[in-house]
């Protein structure tokens, strides 16, 4: 059911979700190893290249520090694993001080896994070990092994995830659901709007924030929200398909028009934006070489904005098609403050495309990757995303180096 997919893919998180996945793994390891900092020998972490890429230069929530080692240390020292993606909600200065010392005991390597992969092995000085494996999704703890005793084993199958289930639906069927959604889904959309507007307002007060790059109030919210999140502001963001930046970029362009439209229309348009974003991510994968905030969620917000303005189904599909045709190829070179500017680019395109769609102006099929049927365009995006994965390896040579 679409409702189940929605609740699986729309969750609050503190901080960038890739280092948060690392923090969740070490927090879970601490829960079972139960050793103090003094009695801990080492923590060895293995990551897929995309998780590694997105954790290199993004600030960790509640700190002015970036790096996967500090995320891992904070997770071990003060993370609350039961809170999932909100694992670092209670970070404080005392914990941060200890984490700086723990960094020296943490080693990180990368592998070639094609999906999100976080393996943490914590070892005590008396050689007890706890192994935690997170696979496929930022909060999916797939395996827990204490010494040689496996107490949890849920093998990850990429073809049998909740995200994959959305491929069973067409865009028309998604619009059908948006027209008659479950009440609890709309209530949750309202919560998502309030949460993401809150961090955006905070971001606008930050000195030197990137919202100054925005040319109108609506785009300012997106830029400020992303900037605040990437800067490590200790506030929650409602994520969409594993990404807070996607959540901000597909929710705020519509939510900030609350004064212009009735509440139900805003909620339904926002829901459509969220579901279209999830739909496209099902084909590209959660972690990809393609920018989610600047490209994929822009297609979602273009659909939502077109719906909000009274666009018909074909106009909504054209808006998705045209956004993909315009922005596909905008790459992800890691999570960072500069993502705010990519989100601005995506939001401005979504606004322009929705206006064109309402006026029945669209990119003809056959222009580039744009197909007649929007679902085919999205399938092409998935195939092409897989074809440029070498980028993810090569870009690691440059991130963090001036």
From Swiss-Prot:
- PANTHER family in the record: UPF0597 PROTEIN YHAM (PTHR30501:SF2)
What domain of life? Bacteria
**InterPro entries referenced in this protein's UniProt entry, alphabetically:** Ser_deHydtase-like_asu (IPR005130), UPF0597 (IPR021144)
Q: Which GO terms describe its biological process?
A: L-cysteine catabolic process to pyruvate
Q: What is this protein called?
A: UPF0597 protein THA_1286
User: HAMAP family per the record?
Assistant: UPF0597
Pfam families per UniProt: SDH_alpha (PF03313)
Family to which this protein belongs: Belongs to the UPF0597 family.
Q: Which organism is it from?
A: Thermosipho africanus (strain TCF52B)
According to the UniProt entry, its GO molecular function terms are: L-cysteine desulfhydrase activity
């Amino acid at each position: 059911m679409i409702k189940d997919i929605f609740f699986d893919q729309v969750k609050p998180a503190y901080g960038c979700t890739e280092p948060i996945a690392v923090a969740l793994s070490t927090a879970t390891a601490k829960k079972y190893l139960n050793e103090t900092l003094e009695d801990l020998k080492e923590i060895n972490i293995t990551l897929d290249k995309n998780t590694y890429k997105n954790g290199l230069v993004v600030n960790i929530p509640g700190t002015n520090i970036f790096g996967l080692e500090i995320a891992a240390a904070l997770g071990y020292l003060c993370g609350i694993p039961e809170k999932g993606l909100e694992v670092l909600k209670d970070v404080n200065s005392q914990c941060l001080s200890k984490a700086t010392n723990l960094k020296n005991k943490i080693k990180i390597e990368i592998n070639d896994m094609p999906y999100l992969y976080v393996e943490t092995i914590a070892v005590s000085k008396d050689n007890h070990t706890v192994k935690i494996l997170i696979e496929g999704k930022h909060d999916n703890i797939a395996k827990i092994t204490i010494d040689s005793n496996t107490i949890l084993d849920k093998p990850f199958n990429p073809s049998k995830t909740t995200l994959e289930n959305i491929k069973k639906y067409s865009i028309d069927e998604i619009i059908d659901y948006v027209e008659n959604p479950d009440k609890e889904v709309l209530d949750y959309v309202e919560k998502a709007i309030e949460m993401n507007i809150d961090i955006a307002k905070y971001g606008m007060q930050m000195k030197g924030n990137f919202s100054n790059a925005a040319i109108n109030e609506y785009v300012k919210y997106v830029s400020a929200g992303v900037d605040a999140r990437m800067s490590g502001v200790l506030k929650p963001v409602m994520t969409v398909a594993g990404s807070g930046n996607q959540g901000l970029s597909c929710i705020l362009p519509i939510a900030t028009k609350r004064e212009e439209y009735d509440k139900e229309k805003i909620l339904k348009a926002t829901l459509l934006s969220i579901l279209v974003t999830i739909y496209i991510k099902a084909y590209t994968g959660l972690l990809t070489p393609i920018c989610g905030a600047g490209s994929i969620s822009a297609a979602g917000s273009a659909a939502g904005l077109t719906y909000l303005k009274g666009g018909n189904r074909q106009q909504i599909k054209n808006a998705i098609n045209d956004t993909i045709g315009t922005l596909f190829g905008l790459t992800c070179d890691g999570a960072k403050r500069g993502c705010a500017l990519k989100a601005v680019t995506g939001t401005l395109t979504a606004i322009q495309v929705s206006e064109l769609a309402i006026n029945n102006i669209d990119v003809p099929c056959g222009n580039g990757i744009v197909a007649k049927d929007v679902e085919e365009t999205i399938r092409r995006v998935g195939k092409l995303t897989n074809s440029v994965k070498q980028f993810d390896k090569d870009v690691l040579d440059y991130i963090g180096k001036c």
